[in-house]
Amino acid sequence: MIETFGNALAEGLVDDKRTKATRAFPPELRRAGRRKLLYLHDASELKDLKAPPGNRLERLKGTWKGFHSIRINDQWRVVFRWAGGNAFDVQIVDYH
């Protein structure tokens, strides 16, 4: 379950709201981004995010150490911290 958000884009998409942040996000990715956020919200264990394989669940390194991600596409990711069966600091970021 998503406990906290790290940016307005992720919060706006999961709530299906039209905000400044969601309007700036590529329109062709809004549905996929929301779907990935809902997968994250429904997950009770980190391993739940391994399916579908297109999620490409990863543990991040470097400045993102302590975070995991699932992919929306090659450029955009849902990034989050996982603890106690919940997701924290959930963000959608341009990873490149």
What feature does the model see in each segment?
Residues 40:
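Conserved phosphate-interacting/catalytic interface
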Residues 8-9, 20, 44, 52-55, ...:
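Residue-level signal for pocket-adjacent positions within structured domains
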Residues 1-37:
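Arg/Lys-rich, positively charged N-terminal/basic patches that mediate binding to nucleic acids
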Residues 44-68:
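A short, surface-exposed loop/turn module that caps and links secondary-structure elements
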Residues 60-61, 67-96:
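Enriched for short, Lys/Arg-rich terminal
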